[in-house]
């Protein structure tokens, strides 16, 4: 099967890449050093634009290792790196529609950086900060109506209907 080609225009950044051919998403990298503070949000430039066909979108999502271990950072004092450490920060989900033509960015939310804060803290340029997953957009239409309540269990597969329940309503084990 032939792969669909998606045009990427670099604007000071690095080409998104897959570490392995079978990977589901492309790694994306920070374009520049980004100074961060406690409890804040940042739109971090990734240094490229993307031209998506109308039937596709791109999702910027966290990398599992960074969600677990934190985002790499460097602590600077008078222009010198004095410490490198992972900080408590997360990449938030972001959706890129086919009509968007600006530079792609990753939304990063910092949490408590604490004692690590004396001096300037940066997420370094070139950090593999997030993943970009290309997704197909189904051709759908929302219509007004009444949502029917399911009263019975699904006898075919043994599942109980969810109804209004959500947010761990089926338990955690």
Regions found by a protein language model. Give the residues of each.
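DUTPase catalytic domain/fold
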Residues: 1-173
């Amino acid at each position: 099967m032939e792969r669909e080609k998606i045009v990427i225009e670099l604007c000071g950044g690095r080409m998104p890449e897959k570490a392995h051919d079978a990977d589901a998403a492309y790694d994306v990298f920070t374009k520049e050093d980004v100074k961060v503070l406690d409890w804040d949000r940042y739109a971090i430039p990734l240094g490229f634009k993307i031209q998506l066909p109308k039937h596709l979108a791109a999702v910027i999502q966290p990398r599992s290792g960074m969600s677990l271990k934190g985002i790499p950072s460097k602590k600077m004092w008078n222009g010198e790196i004095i410490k490198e450490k992972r900080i408590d920060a997360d990449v938030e989900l972001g959706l890129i529609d086919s009509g968007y033509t600006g530079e792609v960015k990753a939304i990063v939310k910092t949490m408590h950086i604490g004692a690590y804060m004396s001096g300037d803290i940066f997420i370094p340029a070139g950090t593999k900060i997030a993943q970009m997953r290309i997704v197909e957009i189904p051709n759908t239409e929302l219509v007004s109506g009444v949502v029917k309540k399911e009263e019975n269990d699904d006898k075919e597969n043994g599942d109980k209907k969810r109804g209004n329940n959500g947010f761990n309503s089926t338990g955690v084990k």
